Amino acid sequence: MMARKSAPPSKAGAFGEDSDHMSRDDAAEGFGQFERFLQEWSRRDFLKRAGGAAAYLAFMAGGAELLAAACGPSTAPTSLTPVKGGKLIEGMISDIANFAVLNAGDTSSQQVITLTFDGLLGIAANGDNIPLLASALPTVSSDSLTFTFKLRPNLKFSDGHALTAEDVVFTYGLMFLPETSDFVSRYRSDLEGYIQSVTAPDPQTVVFKFSKVQASFLDSHCRRGILPKHILGNVTPKALNTHDFWSNPTVVNGVFKFVKWDKGQQVVFARNDNYWAGPSNLDQYIYKVVTDAVVLAQQLKTGEIDVGQPDASQFDNLKTVTTIDALTFARPSFVYYLYNLDKARTSSYAMFSDKNVRKALHMALDRPTMAKAVYFAYATPADSVQVPMDWAYNPNVSPKYKYDKAGAQKLLDDAGWAKGADGIRVKNGQRFSFEINTNSGNKVRENLIQVMQQQWKEIGVEAQPRPIAFQTLVTQLRTTHTFQVILLGISSGDTDPDQTSLWTTKGIGAGGLNGMQYVNPEVDRLMAEALTTTDRAKRKPLYFKIQDILADELPGPILFYPSYLWGINKRVKNFNVGPYNEYQGRAWMKDVFVTDGK
């Protein structure tokens, strides 16, 4: 999955008139909404926790969208004849990290990768597999150990070079072959030990043979972008890790070609005339970096950008703008915070290694109140690592945690963390004090860690909020492991519930997403066993057990299931984004057009 953006997600994974520079009319309207908000869910409770001024600031920065109604997952179908030409500008609150097709772990990078590199299959808005480079879904043997794909005829890369089965063999070889182990791929832990061979009997046929069943292969791993062997085939696996292709992909096969990347500002793409499905309607697509989601909403209003995901505090207002479609829908995503459980990080390990301490911290968070104060009904408190739209979701996961300040304090007392003279708990001479990071520019998450700081302080725990650049956050999680606590989101473009890279020891190594260094042999065993069959009736109980274990252990407590919020200029048509195809399935961008052709 993809550590989201939130989180996006994520996962995980940003203006004139923002929360710091608003007009008097906007401020008055916001305060009126805030007053109604207080009346709705307990003025006394919120003021007690945050104080009047802080409550108002949190409201303005975090969610004036309480009264907004839910909409469908895409723009209304249009009978207009597509207009050729023009450009579309999409605003995003963080820059991309790279075009590392087989290793990108952030949603920003995944989004541009799927614009430039198609896989054998794609994913529809509802999660269904759809053929892209493959002419149809694969033929699968009765024992689920052999997958045979037929490629579409006359496939080409953007430079006109033929795309054949050999390119598929080359790409997948980087993810499982022993001789390519020096190449870092986040998917190696999912495929190594399962794939026996990938062969090309002829230029149009690819055969995957497995030594044992890998149940998530079809729904999770057939969408990997296919790389050009004629460009990268002579590069050693180790050298490939730092090859400039990942920042300057000169040859692609997706709907758009890469033009340039102005870091911190924009990524520019042009129509790929050699695209297998025909050239896109748009001449140009621009990924614009707008590092503040409030500013992003303002740029939607002014037309500086055409589409984007606005800050929650601006969403209700966007619904009143006649030039914008404001859309919201459920997403396969959760927002969570995770601890650094690496024993080598002695300070963090001393605080967080005891699961009862982790339980205490989670019980101290008033999540229903937080959901209303920050998300305003566009998120629901979460209890499971699986999302409700997943077939493996356990609605009766156990244990579940209610807000219990007294219970949290007792757990900390029992664990030997006693309050010091300044009210902060101490054990063996160490103060219970740590830094919590999230991605800067995401106002909802910045507000969340502020509220978490306040509520943890009430039980004698000192948290120091520190928002940092998203790509720095990703580096801390996946590479340096220098964090103490991180809050972020996980967004998945996959419909398979496998989370091996997130919670098992396989995900601790290079390229994995288990940056918390969580180790539980039973989770490892159950996750592996769940991949040994494609029978959902057999897999489901195993995932239920995993959810119970992670709910009890809380290495990365799940806070919320957020909704997608989108603003789309009405000049944009066929922008058919949905729950599953936002980051990992952008082939539909071929049919997007702008009515003025500009």
Per-region residue spans from a language model:
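Detector for C-terminal structural segments
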Residues: 14-16, 27, 51-52, 57-66, ...
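N-terminal secretory signal peptides
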Residues: 1-45, 60, 65-69
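N-terminal lobe/hinge region of extracytoplasmic solute-binding protein
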Residues: 91-142, 173, 251-253
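Ligand-site clamp/hinge motif
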Residues: 244-247, 272-318, 332, 450-453, ...
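Surface-exposed binding/hinge segments that line
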Residues: 150, 186-235
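Gly/Pro-rich hinge or "lid" segments in bacterial periplasmic/extracellular proteins
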Residues: 125-128, 222-280, 284, 294, ...
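Alpha-helical secondary-structure segments
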Residues: 89, 164-171, 203-209, 254-255, ...
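Aromatic- and charge-enriched surface segment that lines or borders ligand/interaction sites
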Residues: 136-182, 207, 296-299, 351-353
